[in-house]
Amino acid sequence: MTLAEEFRSRNFSIYGQWTGVLCIILCIALGIANIFSFAVLRIIFSVLCLISGLILIFIEVPFLLRICPTSSKFDAFIRRFTTNWMRAAMYGVMSVVQWLSLLPGSGASSLIVAAVFLLIASIFYALAGLKSQEFVGSKTLGGQGLVQMIV
């Protein structure tokens, strides 16, 4: 299945996964950009954003669990997020954490962009769950086709 065919499938988990890839890029970039601040709360939220981005890499690009040396506890933690509902909940929690970066001690920052895109990914996964669509991983990002080629 090509990338265009994946998007035409109208499976919201595909949309959620590709929005998740965008969230990875945004969380890492904005986490690094906002860490150079004098506001202690903003530094804390930027570190949390950076950690979120690093966790999302392993959740959204599954073949990385096979090629990167990780502990069995970390692998078990990542494998919890295989359903649409669990991913929607995870993205929702990460979004709420970034929305909390608007607290008065931190002030408004570009971390809001990460919060918005994390919320969009959460909505896509929740819609997939509501429509009872099975989670389908993109083959481009390491779905079944790529994983079988590596093994």
Curated annotation (Swiss-Prot):
Golgi membrane protein involved in vesicular trafficking. It is a multi-pass membrane protein. The gene is tvp18. The keyword Transmembrane helix applies. Belongs to the TVP18 family. Glycans are attached at residue 11. One of its GO terms (biological process) is vesicle-mediated transport. Keywords: Glycoprotein, Golgi apparatus, Membrane, Transmembrane, Transmembrane helix. This is Golgi apparatus membrane protein tvp18. It comes from the Eukaryota. The keyword Lyase does not apply. The chain crosses the membrane at residues 21-41, 43-63, 88-108, 110-130. Its main location: Golgi. It is found in: Golgi apparatus membrane. InterPro entries: TVP18/Ca-channel_flower. One of its GO terms (cellular component) is Golgi membrane. It comes from Aspergillus fumigatus (strain ATCC MYA-4609 / CBS 101355 / FGSC A1100 / Af293) (Neosartorya fumigata).
